[in-house]
Amino acid sequence: FLSLIPHAINAVSALVHHF
């Protein structure tokens, strides 16, 4: 689960970068 947290943060970061 801990390995999944950074992935989620990266996805959100990419989303914010897109907008």
UniProtKB/Swiss-Prot annotation:
Any GO BP annotation: defense response
Cellular-component GO terms for this entry: extracellular region
Residues with PTM Phenylalanine amide: F19
UniProt keyword annotation of Secreted present: yes
Tissues where this protein is expressed: Expressed by the skin glands.
Protein keywords: Amidation, Amphibian defense peptide, Antimicrobial, Secreted
Source taxon at top rank: Eukaryota
Localization per record: Secreted
Its biological purpose: Has antimicrobial activity.
Family according to the record: Belongs to the frog skin active peptide (FSAP) family. Phylloseptin subfamily.
Protein name: Phylloseptin-H10
Naturally occurring in which organism (per UniProt): Pithecopus hypochondrialis (Orange-legged leaf frog)
